[in-house]
């Protein structure tokens, strides 16, 4: 009975799923050709002291793809022709976040040897922090080095296991 139920379940599930529909921005048009975007561009407000800032902003947006409402949309599906919209900034964000994390980790390891560790966590010791920050740009190479040498990960004997 269990096998029959499992077989029926597998058959029903395999026929009930529809393949995912991929629109890939089918309703998006270049903003420069979009009438709704052109109407928005005519009423562009300046956001800085530059009297041309609104016009310049809409000139940059005209290179993007707009929806029927006239607003630019980000294409984040991995196509390389739109890498500058999302892929490059996201990789840069991950690099900077990794730099901050790596430098923070190295600073905490460096001050662990001192007697006033808690105070140095609250008020940074710039004599220790600045050289670490300066070398933090190479954090991907340092992370690979520490991973291969075993410094980055804890040994199995150091990891506690819950008695449950």
Swiss-Prot record:
Instruction: Report the main location listed first in the record.
Output: membrane
Q: Among the record's GO biological process terms, what is one? A: photosynthesis
UniProt entry keywords in alphabetical sequence: Membrane, Photosynthesis, Photosystem I, Signal, Thylakoid, Transmembrane, Transmembrane helix
InterPro entries, A to Z: PSI_PsaF, PSI_PsaF_sf
Q: Give me the Gene Ontology terms describing cellular component.
A: photosystem I reaction center; plasma membrane-derived thylakoid membrane
Q: Where in the cell is it found?
A: Cellular thylakoid membrane
Q: Quick check: keyword Signal in the entry?
A: yes
Q: Which Pfam family, giving just one, matches this sequence?
A: PSI_PsaF
Transmembrane domains' residue ranges = 83-103, 124-144
Q: State what this protein does.
A: Probably participates in efficiency of electron transfer from plastocyanin to P700 (or cytochrome c553 in algae and cyanobacteria). This plastocyanin-docking protein contributes to the specific association of plastocyanin to PSI.
Q: What is this protein called?
A: Photosystem I reaction center subunit III
What gene makes this protein? psaF
């Amino acid at each position: 009975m269990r096998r029959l139920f499992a077989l029926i379940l597998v058959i029903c599930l395999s026929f009930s799923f529809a393949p995912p529909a991929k629109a890939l921005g089918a309703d998006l048009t270049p903003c420069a050709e979009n009438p709704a975007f052109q109407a928005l561009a005519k009423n562009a407000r300046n956001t800085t002291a530059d009297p041309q800032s609104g016009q310049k902003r809409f000139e940059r947006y005209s290179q993007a793809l707009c929806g029927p409402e006239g607003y630019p949309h980000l294409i984040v599906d991995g196509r390389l022709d739109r890498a500058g919209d999302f892929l490059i900034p996201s990789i840069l964000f991950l690099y900077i976040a990794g730099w901050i994390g790596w430098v923070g980790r190295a600073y905490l390891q460096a001050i662990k040897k001192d007697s006033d560790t808690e105070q140095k966590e609250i008020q940074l010791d710039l004599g220790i922090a600045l050289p670490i920050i300066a070398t933090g740009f190479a954090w991907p190479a340092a992370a690979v080095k520490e991973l291969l040498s075993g410094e980055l990960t804890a040994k199995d004997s150091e990891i506690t296991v819950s008695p449950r």
